[in-house]
């Protein structure tokens, strides 16, 4: 069974754990740097990205997270987690982990649309997935090596680049575990490659 970590500094940690377990993998709440060694994949949950960055800095997680990103093990960022994975953030000079060749805008759906739900069609996952958007970012631009998995209107809301997956919405806040299951499959495939 693959072991998937959920970064436990802030955000929808418990809901991600439930979704990972419902998808047939073991979930670990990561609160210490050395736990990164023990997992096969990592979820960066939604939350408030500036608060999360402050906590990442406080507990000296940034370099270990960048090292994890270079290790070939899959990472999945939802909402604030997508912001952490992006190489370029509109209005900000520096990236956080900066693992994905994407440009992201924070709070991109505007204050009047603080939160809403939308039925999404997601490549590799299926139709009618209810995306829960809460002060959500979205992907403004992608490099050629990034696959766009889903759009809401003309805005890119789910993308994949090799072992990295990012979503604007919160898949863990529904009882539909298909997006988490898709990530679990990515982790299984990456683990199989390492074994060979």
Swiss-Prot record:
Record key words, sorted: Glutamine amidotransferase, Hydrolase, Lyase, Pyridoxal phosphate
Catalytic activity annotation: aldehydo-D-ribose 5-phosphate + D-glyceraldehyde 3-phosphate + L-glutamine = pyridoxal 5'-phosphate + L-glutamate + phosphate + 3 H2O + H(+); L-glutamine + H2O = L-glutamate + NH4(+)
Domain of life: Bacteria
GO biological process assignments: glutamine catabolic process; pyridoxal phosphate biosynthetic process; pyridoxine metabolic process
Positions contributing to L-glutamine binding: 47-49, 106, 134-135
EC number: 4.3.3.6, 3.5.1.2
Pathway named in the protein's UniProt entry: Cofactor biosynthesis; pyridoxal 5'-phosphate biosynthesis
InterPro entries referenced in this protein's UniProt entry, alphabetically: Class_I_gatase-like, PdxT/SNO, PdxT/SNO_CS
Active site, per annotation: 79 (nucleophile), 170 (charge relay system), 172 (charge relay system)
GO terms assigned for molecular function: glutaminase activity; pyridoxal 5'-phosphate synthase (glutamine hydrolysing) activity
Any one annotated GO CC term: glutaminase complex
Pfam families: SNO (PF01174)
HAMAP family registered for this protein in UniProt: PdxT (MF_01615)
Function: Catalyzes the hydrolysis of glutamine to glutamate and ammonia as part of the biosynthesis of pyridoxal 5'-phosphate. The resulting ammonia molecule is channeled to the active site of PdxS.
Family stated for the protein in its record: Belongs to the glutaminase PdxT/SNO family.
Subunit (UniProt): In the presence of PdxS, forms a dodecamer of heterodimers. Only shows activity in the heterodimer.
Protein name: Pyridoxal 5'-phosphate synthase subunit PdxT
Origin species: Bacillus cereus (strain G9842)
């Amino acid at each position: 069974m693959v072991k998937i970590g959920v970064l436990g500094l802030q955000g929808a940690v418990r809901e991600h754990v439930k979704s990972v377990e419902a998808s047939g993998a073991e979930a670990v709440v990561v609160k210490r740097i050395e736990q990164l060694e023990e997992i096969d994949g990592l979820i960066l949950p939604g939350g408030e990205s500036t608060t999360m960055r402050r906590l990442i800095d406080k507990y000296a997680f940034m370099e270990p997270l960048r090292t994890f990103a270079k290790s070939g093990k899959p990472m999945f960022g939802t909402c604030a987690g997508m912001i952490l994975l992006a190489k370029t953030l509109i209005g900000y000079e520096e990236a956080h982990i900066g693992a994905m060749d994407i440009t992201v805008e924070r709070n991109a759906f505007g204050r009047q649309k603080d939160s809403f739900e939308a039925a999404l069609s997601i490549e590799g996952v299926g139709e009618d997935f209810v995306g829960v958007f809460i002060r959500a970012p979205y992907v403004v631009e992608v490099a050629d090596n990034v696959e766009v998995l889903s759009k809401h209107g003309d805005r890119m809301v789910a993308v994949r680049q090799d072992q990295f997956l990012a979503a604007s919405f919160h898949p863990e806040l529904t009882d539909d575990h298909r997006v988490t299951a898709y990530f679990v499959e990515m982790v299984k495939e990456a683990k199989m490659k390492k074994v060979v």
